[in-house]
Protein backbone atom coordinates (compact mmCIF):
# COMPACT_ATOMS: atom_id res chain seq x y z
CA UNK A 1 0.00 0.00 0.00
CA UNK A 2 1.33 3.50 -0.78
CA UNK A 3 3.05 5.38 2.04
CA UNK A 4 2.87 9.12 2.66
CA UNK A 5 4.71 11.51 4.95
CA UNK A 6 2.62 14.36 6.37
CA UNK A 7 4.47 17.45 7.55
CA UNK A 8 2.42 19.96 9.47
CA UNK A 9 3.52 23.44 10.44
CA UNK A 10 1.79 26.44 11.96
CA UNK A 11 2.83 29.93 13.01
CA UNK A 12 3.42 30.58 16.71
CA UNK A 13 0.18 32.55 17.07
CA UNK A 14 -1.80 29.51 15.86
CA UNK A 15 -0.01 27.09 18.20
CA UNK A 16 -2.32 25.31 20.65
CA UNK A 17 0.04 26.38 23.42
CA UNK A 18 -0.73 30.05 22.63
CA UNK A 19 -4.14 30.06 20.96
CA UNK A 20 -7.29 29.08 22.87
CA UNK A 21 -9.28 28.24 19.73
CA UNK A 22 -6.70 25.89 18.24
CA UNK A 23 -6.08 24.37 21.66
CA UNK A 24 -9.77 23.50 21.92
CA UNK A 25 -9.80 22.07 18.37
CA UNK A 26 -6.72 19.95 19.12
CA UNK A 27 -7.87 18.66 22.50
CA UNK A 28 -11.37 17.83 21.28
CA UNK A 29 -10.30 16.55 17.86
CA UNK A 30 -7.33 14.38 18.82
CA UNK A 31 -9.54 11.58 20.14
CA UNK A 32 -11.42 11.47 16.81
CA UNK A 33 -8.29 10.91 14.69
CA UNK A 34 -8.13 7.10 15.08
CA UNK A 35 -11.81 6.71 14.17
CA UNK A 36 -11.48 9.00 11.13
CA UNK A 37 -8.34 7.17 10.01
CA UNK A 38 -10.14 3.84 10.29
CA UNK A 39 -13.15 5.19 8.37
CA UNK A 40 -10.88 6.34 5.52
CA UNK A 41 -8.72 3.18 5.73
CA UNK A 42 -5.59 5.09 6.69
CA UNK A 43 -3.00 3.30 8.81
CA UNK A 44 -0.55 5.32 10.91
CA UNK A 45 2.96 3.84 10.69
CA UNK A 46 4.48 6.62 12.81
CA UNK A 47 2.93 9.52 14.65
CA UNK A 48 1.31 11.86 14.81
CA UNK A 49 4.44 13.27 16.42
CA UNK A 50 4.95 16.83 17.67
CA UNK A 51 8.48 18.07 16.97
CA UNK A 52 9.45 19.75 20.21
CA UNK A 53 8.95 23.49 20.19
CA UNK A 54 9.34 23.86 16.42
CA UNK A 55 5.62 24.35 15.65
CA UNK A 56 5.85 21.28 13.42
CA UNK A 57 4.35 17.83 13.41
CA UNK A 58 4.91 14.72 11.34
CA UNK A 59 3.17 11.45 10.59
CA UNK A 60 3.80 8.52 8.27
CA UNK A 61 0.71 6.78 6.95
CA UNK A 62 -0.40 4.13 4.51
CA UNK A 63 -3.42 4.94 2.36
CA UNK A 64 -4.96 3.91 -0.94
CA UNK A 65 -4.23 7.30 -2.51
CA UNK A 66 -3.02 10.82 -1.88
CA UNK A 67 -6.62 11.94 -2.31
CA UNK A 68 -7.58 9.81 0.69
CA UNK A 69 -4.84 11.48 2.74
CA UNK A 70 -6.05 14.91 1.61
CA UNK A 71 -9.60 13.98 2.63
CA UNK A 72 -8.28 12.98 6.07
CA UNK A 73 -6.54 16.36 6.41
CA UNK A 74 -9.76 18.18 5.48
CA UNK A 75 -12.15 16.13 7.65
CA UNK A 76 -9.83 16.22 10.66
CA UNK A 77 -9.69 20.02 10.53
CA UNK A 78 -5.89 20.01 10.58
CA UNK A 79 -5.92 22.28 7.54
CA UNK A 80 -7.69 25.00 9.57
CA UNK A 81 -4.57 25.88 11.53
CA UNK A 82 -1.72 24.03 9.81
CA UNK A 83 -0.01 24.12 6.49
CA UNK A 84 0.22 20.44 5.52
CA UNK A 85 2.68 18.97 3.02
CA UNK A 86 2.04 15.44 1.80
CA UNK A 87 4.86 13.49 0.13
CA UNK A 88 4.81 9.98 -1.25
CA UNK A 89 7.40 7.76 0.39
CA UNK A 90 9.12 4.48 -0.40
CA UNK A 91 11.26 2.10 1.56
CA UNK A 92 14.92 1.99 0.57
CA UNK A 93 14.51 -1.39 -1.20
CA UNK A 94 11.53 0.02 -3.13
CA UNK A 95 13.56 3.09 -4.15
CA UNK A 96 16.47 0.92 -5.32
CA UNK A 97 14.10 -1.20 -7.40
CA UNK A 98 12.55 1.96 -8.83
CA UNK A 99 15.99 3.22 -9.93
CA UNK A 100 16.11 0.37 -12.45
CA UNK A 101 13.49 2.26 -14.47
CA UNK A 102 15.42 5.55 -14.48
CA UNK A 103 17.54 6.42 -17.55
CA UNK A 104 21.31 5.90 -17.19
CA UNK A 105 23.09 8.33 -14.83
CA UNK A 106 23.98 11.72 -16.26
CA UNK A 107 27.40 11.93 -14.61
Task: Name what the model sees in each region.
Residues 1-55, 64-68, 94-107:
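Short S/T/G/P-rich N-terminal loop/turn motif that feeds into the first structured element of a domain
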Amino acid sequence: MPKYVLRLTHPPDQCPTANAKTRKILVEGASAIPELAEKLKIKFLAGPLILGTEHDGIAVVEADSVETVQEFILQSGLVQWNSVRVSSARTLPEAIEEMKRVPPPLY
